[in-house]
């Protein structure tokens, strides 16, 4: 266990960041699953815009890697084009 006050504070801050990042990642994953289940192209396109924004924001904040965000956006775009 940490002995110094600053180390204890870092542990608390890291735990808070971890929870926030996990929430963001889970929200993003849920939105992606919803997009994959949509059969209507117009609805998929509108949902795609929000998912892309979520992925870009997550990549910008280093929650996910930027290449993973790019690959996911590419796969989702291919999925929408197949509808």
Curated annotation (Swiss-Prot):
<dbReference type="InterPro" id="IPR036510">
    <property type="entry name" value="Ribosomal_bS20_sf"/>
</dbReference>
<keyword id="KW-0699">rRNA-binding</keyword>
<dbReference type="GO" id="GO:0070181">
    <property type="term" value="F:small ribosomal subunit rRNA binding"/>
</dbReference>
<keyword id="KW-0694">RNA-binding</keyword>
<keyword id="KW-0687">Ribonucleoprotein</keyword>
<protein>
    <recommendedName>
        <fullName>Small ribosomal subunit protein bS20</fullName>
    </recommendedName>
</protein>
<dbReference type="GO" id="GO:0015935">
    <property type="term" value="C:small ribosomal subunit"/>
</dbReference>
<comment type="similarity">
    <text>Belongs to the bacterial ribosomal protein bS20 family.</text>
</comment>
<dbReference type="InterPro" id="IPR002583">
    <property type="entry name" value="Ribosomal_bS20"/>
</dbReference>
<dbReference type="GO" id="GO:0006412">
    <property type="term" value="P:translation"/>
</dbReference>
<dbReference type="Pfam" id="PF01649">
    <property type="entry name" value="Ribosomal_S20p"/>
</dbReference>
<dbReference type="GO" id="GO:0003735">
    <property type="term" value="F:structural constituent of ribosome"/>
</dbReference>
<dbReference type="GO" id="GO:0005829">
    <property type="term" value="C:cytosol"/>
</dbReference>
<comment type="function">
    <text>Binds directly to 16S ribosomal RNA.</text>
</comment>
<keyword id="KW-0689">Ribosomal protein</keyword>
